[in-house]
Amino acid sequence: MKGIAKSPANADYIDALPVNMLATPKEVLNSSGYLRSFPGIDKRDDVAGLSRGVQFNTHESVVYRVLGGKLYRGQSQVGDVSGAGRISMAHSATSQAVAANGVLTLYRYDGTTKTLQNWPSTVGDVTYAQYDIGSVRDVCRLRGRYLWVKDGSQDFGVTDLEDESHPDQYRPFYTAESQPDGILACDTWRDFAVMFGSSTIEYFSLTGSTDTSAAIYVSQPSLMVQKGIAGTRCKCKFGDSHAFISNPSGGAPSVYAISQGSAAPIATASIEKILRSYSASDLSSAVMETLRFDGHELMIIHLPGHVLCYDASASSNGPQWNIMKTGLYDSPHRGIDFMFEGNQITCGDKTEAVTGQLNFSSSAQYGAQQEHLLYTPLFKADNMRVFDFELEASTGVAQIADRLFLSATTDGINFGREQMIEQNSSFAYDRRVLWRRFGHIRKNVGVKVRIITSSPVTLSGCQVRLE
């Protein structure tokens, strides 16, 4: 469900992606699917700052967020977090861990706070080895231990079973030898520790050994993926495995999903054009996350100048992407760190110190109307007259009369004057969205549909009459 246009820069045909609209593959009124506006955002709370990270704590059954310089448990502040950049989170049966500013801090559920540090050098007549913990880049948890990535090295460390604020007493560090430039991120998959580098993704399994001289983790070469990630947040759990943005060191960046030890591309050519427009440093700052509601399985990629959304549930006939934005121009969507909380989907914010919650009865963001764009494919209409351009719309839910703006293109690049059509007003549930006299077409034609509204938008069944 996307249009076709031409690029004025290189004369290539490109996908005209829908903006703020999600495709739903469902039979409706002789159509194979329809497009529905992304839910709006209502304000929830004023908070300490911009959103830096989120995790659902399964032990406490509550969402932990880092907002500005504070850690929030639900809607209550429980601690201070240093720095201002993105953070990594993990949790155990006794603590919520936050890796920020190179330090791993454990916020225990009893109210105390600990940081990852070496055991005391001597306790009575017992001497403990002292290790170089380094700067913590990323953190995850597997079984009874936290795993942290030592920034700038090929090593990752594991905490002790007795006290998770200290490294393992006997064999705390392991090396991803296929990643000479250092591990960028870590995560878990089933019972494996996953180490993401710029050229490979390496898997480590537990050995189960109780011998203090034996390794806790051992590499599994059969699962290694010969692709790397672009940055620490450029991966997320998606489906049964992971999705990631590939590192430019392996060629032009793309988006891949890992399946059975291999990486399968899920990006289209138009998405890859957007990705390669960024420098390696800008691409490394991207953030990936997943979101699920109403049958949509979404993967959201937050880039510095774009927010891209992939819908796995609508991609059976090809990858279905759309663009998410805020306002009437090209500002990236302001919501980030979406999480199902209670019976609401809540989110942080990139631009203001607030949190929000999705409102499925609106498309407004914090009360402001949003722009929605759709494009039809270019179709042949050689020397023909076009009448009765019509869209099926679910109308009648607007508080004020909304207008839909239609404009045509004959070359796929330049769009003409917009035609305004009233498309939504209170209780007019059977209103037709109809442009009766479209005009004479010499060769090809395509249409852009633009709607600025705070009401939900549902469109399908585009059709015209040719003579």
Kindly label every feature range from the protein language model.
Residues T105-G111, Q154-P167, I201, L308-S315, ...:
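Short beta-strand segments and strand-loop junctions that repeat across beta-rich extracellular domains
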Residues M1-S95, Q226-S241, P248-E467:
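Beta-sheet repeat architectures centered on beta-propellers
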Residues S61, G69, T94-S95, G102-L104, ...:
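Beta-strand-connecting loop/turn residues
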Residues P39-L50, S76-G85, Q117-R145, V149-V287:
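Beta-propeller and closely related beta-pinwheel folds
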Residues R65, V98-A99, W148, M195, ...:
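Residue position within the beta-strands of beta-propeller blades
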